[in-house]
C-alpha cells in the first residue's frame, strides 16, 4: 500500500522460496517477493552508506503501520514478520531489472551485509524449471524435496541445511534418474521400491 498507493495485497507480490517452488512443508517459512517501484530503487541506491539497510527499515516501517503489535525486523536481505500464532513471513523487497529491451525477468534485491550491495534473482525461471522437472519425474522431485525437509527438521535441525540447497541438490540429482519397468534390471541388480536407476 505504502509504495504503490494501491489497496491490492497481491498485485505486486508473489510467493518465492520453497512455497514458490512447490517444495514447502508445514514447517517452512513463507517467503514473499514484494516488487517495488523503480523510483524507490533510485532513491535507496543513491543513499550513501548502506541504502539497502535503509530500504529494509522502510519496508519494516510500512508493515508496522498494518501490523503494529507484530514482531517485525530487518535481517540481511529480508524483513522477517513473526506473528504470535507461529506464522513467519520473510518479505523480500525487489525491483525489476530493466534493460534497453525492457524487463529481463530478473529482480534486484538488497543485501545489507558488508556495507550493502544489490543481488539478482530470477524466481519465476527457477519455479518453472522445478515444475518441469517435477512433471518429467512423475512428481518425484517435489516429494523428495519435501521428504528431505521433513527428515532435516525432525532429525538434523542443528545442521541448518537451507531449503534452496536441498532443492538444488535434488534437482541436479534427479536429472540423471529414470524409471524402470517392473522386473527390469540395472547394473547393480534388482531395484526394490523406487524402481529407478542412475545413468
Name the predicted role of every residue range:
Residues 25-26, 43-46, 102-103:
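Short, solvent-exposed loop/turn and secondary-structure capping segments
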